[in-house]
């Protein structure tokens, strides 16, 4: 594995290797010294063309726990977000000798282009509405830790599927891992090509909840919308929000997930987000372990080992 650009690229063995490695990395968090020497002397660049606190910080902590040197590069504004400007940035990264570049970009496909311009490994940290592979991996890791398996589980993804890179990455990964995925959304918030996805589609949340092992709520992404996709926020919440009454329809063992940040009171009620079945806080903690695993698998080993491989 040279890059992590899309969960659609991951075979079952690849995905399981990341999850199993993340299990080992999670034990580092419980150790007296929460650090491994694995990536000492390697440089990881966090290249973020969109604002992000949660994901950028998670990657930074992950790299530092593996003893890598970390450079945070924040690029704001459209003048550096397309075409030659991205290529110029790639040339700068090459001059720095970056071993890995963690890239978040508003344009779908930007990390793929970057991967063709640099010799180091590229990790897609979210590109437009396309994908967010490490979010899907940490979601799968969280589900497996809570429920013990992924194969055969019924996972329901609810909300703004149209604009959600998290939904796309989860659909491909969870399907590869043997889960059955259903998406629930207003017709206006489903992508045109949804019929080609390996999912069932429903418009009735309450009918799906009793059959769900996992319910993953998505944030309504107003910043990516160019038109009104639903009448009002109140109407959206009434039809597709997860409140205490709807959560009571779920099986006792079922989990509630959210990639964050949440809009409390719209897509999810605080009483549900803070309930024992919620994994929201665990997802943040597990994100560090999963991103450690990804960086370890991409860069692990000494320079001599890499040159001889």
UniProtKB/Swiss-Prot annotation:
GO terms for biological process: 'de novo' pyrimidine nucleobase biosynthetic process; 'de novo' UMP biosynthetic process; amino acid metabolic process. Its EC number is 2.1.3.2. Catalyzes the condensation of carbamoyl phosphate and aspartate to form carbamoyl aspartate and inorganic phosphate, the committed step in the de novo pyrimidine nucleotide biosynthesis pathway. It holds the Pfam family OTCace_N. Keywords: Pyrimidine biosynthesis, Transferase. This is Aspartate carbamoyltransferase catalytic subunit. It is an enzyme of class 2 (transferase). Heterododecamer (2C3:3R2) of six catalytic PyrB chains organized as two trimers (C3), and six regulatory PyrI chains organized as three dimers (R2). It comes from Parafrankia sp. (strain EAN1pec). Transmembrane segments: none annotated. One of its GO terms (cellular component) is cytosol. InterPro entries: Asp/Orn_carbamoyltranf_P-bd, Asp/Orn_carbamoylTrfase, Asp/Orn_carbamoylTrfase_sf, Asp_carbamoyltransf, Asp_carbamoyltransf_Asp/Orn-bd. Belongs to the aspartate/ornithine carbamoyltransferase superfamily. ATCase family. Pathway: Pyrimidine metabolism; UMP biosynthesis via de novo pathway; (S)-dihydroorotate from bicarbonate: step 2/3. L-aspartate binds at residues 82, 165, 219. Carbamoyl phosphate binds at residues 54-55, 104, 132, 135, 260-261. One of its GO terms (molecular function) is amino acid binding.
């Amino acid at each position: 594995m040279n890059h992590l650009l899309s969960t659609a690229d991951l075979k079952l063995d690849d995905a399981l290797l990341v999850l199993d490695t993340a299990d080992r990395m999670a034990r580092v968090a419980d150790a007296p010294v929460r650090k491994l020497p694995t990536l000492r002397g390697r440089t990881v660049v966090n290249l973020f063309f969109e604002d992000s606190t949660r994901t950028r910080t998670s990657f930074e902590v992950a790299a530092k726990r593996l003893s890598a040197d970390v450079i945070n590069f924040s690029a704001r504004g459209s003048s550096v977000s397309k075409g030659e400007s991205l290529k110029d940035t790639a040339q700068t990264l090459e001059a720095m000798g970056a071993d890995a570049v963690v890239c978040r970009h508003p344009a779908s496909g930007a990390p793929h282009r970057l991967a063709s311009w640099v010799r180091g490994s590229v990790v897609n940290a979210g590109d437009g509405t396309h994908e967010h592979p490490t979010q899907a991996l940490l979601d799968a890791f969280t589900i497996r830790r809570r429920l013990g398996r992924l194969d055969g589980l019924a996972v329901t993804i609810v909300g703004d599927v149209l604009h959600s890179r998290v939904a796309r990455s989860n659909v491909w990964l969870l399907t590869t891992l043997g889960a059955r995925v259903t998406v629930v959304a207003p017709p206006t918030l489903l992508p045109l090509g949804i019929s080609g996805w390996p999912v069932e589609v429903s418009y009735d949340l309450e009918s799906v909840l009793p059959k769900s092992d996992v319910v993953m709520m998505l944030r309504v992404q107003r910043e990516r919308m160019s038109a009104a996709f639903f009448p009002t926020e109140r109407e959206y919440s009434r039809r597709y929000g997860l409140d205490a009454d709807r959560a009571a329809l779920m099986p006792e063992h079922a989990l509630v997930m959210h990639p964050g940040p949440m809009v409390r009171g719209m897509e999810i009620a605080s009483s549900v987000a803070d309930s024992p079945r919620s994994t929201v806080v665990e997802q943040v903690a597990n994100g560090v372990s999963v991103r450690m695993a990804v960086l370890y698998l991409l860069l692990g080993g000494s320079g001599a080992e890499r040159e001889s491989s």
